[in-house]
């Protein structure tokens, strides 16, 4: 079996406050800043900024 890599799963939460989120893989060795993407929020029905939070 293959080794488990160093990638982490992180939650990208909507800044619109709708509670909608995406789950993304992240390599902590390469990225030191928090991830942020402008993606579609179907609850708000528009593109908003999604920022990284810890996945629990």
From Swiss-Prot:
Belongs to the bacterial ribosomal protein bL33 family. This is Large ribosomal subunit protein bL33. GO terms for biological process: translation. GO terms for molecular function: structural constituent of ribosome. Keywords: Ribonucleoprotein, Ribosomal protein. GO terms for cellular component: cytoplasm; large ribosomal subunit. It comes from Ehrlichia ruminantium (strain Gardel).
